[in-house]
Amino acid sequence: MKQEHIMKVFWTEEAKIEFKQTLMYWTIHNMSDSYSKKIDVETLKLVKEITTSPYLLANYIETIDAYKRVFFKSRFILYYQVDEKNDTIYILHFRSSSQKPL
């Protein structure tokens, strides 16, 4: 059986901050962390998928030289770059789909 190739993942500081702020916003807005936990789980699922198939269902955004994946009922967007030479995925931004596009 052929083993699946898994790329490394690196979150930029900006992406980490955006992700944490989103989770905090929904926890405060809903007065509960249950929705934030769902966002976290769906994000981890997507990142895992990207590590093995980075181009699957992704749109390339030439102006920012990054790939874009919309996920979790089209509510959130992950922007990332693929560095095949270093076998790494760089998560650049985590955004709500209601925010102004990059």
Q: Where in this protein do the model-derived segments appear?
A:
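Enriched for short, Lys/Arg-rich terminal
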Residues: 2, 72-102
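Arg/Lys-rich, positively charged N-terminal/basic patches that mediate binding to nucleic acids
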Residues: 1-41
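Conserved protein kinase catalytic domain
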Residues: 23, 44-47, 95
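Short, well-ordered turn and helix-capping elements at secondary-structure junctions
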Residues: 13, 30, 54, 74, ...
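Localized chelating/binding microdomains
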Residues: 14, 62-66, 102
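Short amphipathic alpha-helical interaction/hinge segments
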Residues: 23, 51-58, 102
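Compact soluble domain cores
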Residues: 39-54
